[in-house]
């Protein structure tokens, strides 16, 4: 899959904020919501976006040992 500047911007924004809604994402990269959503779905279907995850704070969860 060939990435243009919009695709690259989408990936960059989602790396920093995977919970951003499509409307806000579209505004940040300068697209209207429909084409933005189509691009996100295409990136997901191509496997470039493999998922969305939560990062947990081990200390706040009371976990003192982390095994790798």
Question: For the regions a protein language model found, what residue spans apply to each?
Answer:
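A compositional/biophysical signature of low hydrophobicity enriched in polar/charged and small residues
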Residues: 1-68
């Amino acid at each position: 899959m060939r990435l243009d500047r919009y695709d690259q911007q989408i990936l960059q924004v989602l790396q920093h904020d995977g919970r951003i809604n499509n409307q806000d994402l579209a505004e940040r990269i300068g697209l209207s919501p429909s084409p933005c959503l189509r691009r996100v779905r295409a990136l997901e279907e191509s496997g470039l976006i493999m998922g969305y995850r939560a990062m947990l704070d081990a200390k706040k969860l009371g976990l003192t040992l982390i095994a790798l």
